Amino acid sequence: MNMEDEFIINNDFIKYKVNSINEINLRNLEVVNKNKQLGLIDIEIEQFNEDISLIYNTRGYKTLRDYLLNPLSKEKAYSLLNCINKCYEVQSYLLDTGIVSLKTNFIFLKEINSIPYCYFIYIPNTSKYHKNEEDFKKLIFAVIISIEDNDLRNEALSL
């Protein structure tokens, strides 16, 4: 099953159809919406009859996939790699593994004073779509190959 098949994605929001309310850890939703410092995008629950969806407001954000289309300065590359580490902090805080996607089209950025800040989306049962370890490796590689400084890029690739 492809993860993107269960999402409606546009420039302003992402909508994820949930199979059952039991799939959602309501404590995690509360934590996401109350703790802005975690780097998670706010979630709204939309219910229409038996259909339940999670709505993520992504207006004003850029996907990491789009961000990596341009070469990265050394400073922005380090900032992004630090942002990615934040993902593991989020998972340990929510006490739930596999709850954020490390795919580049599900990580969002907002630049503040020319520094990129990463924001993740909480997705129940993310692990049914992929292995975060594989996606983490792909993500690191995507950031590294976008670095414009050849020496730094080559050094990072040799690690």
Question: How would you name each of these model-derived features?
Answer:
Residues 81-95:
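Short C-lobe core helix of eukaryotic-like protein kinase catalytic domains
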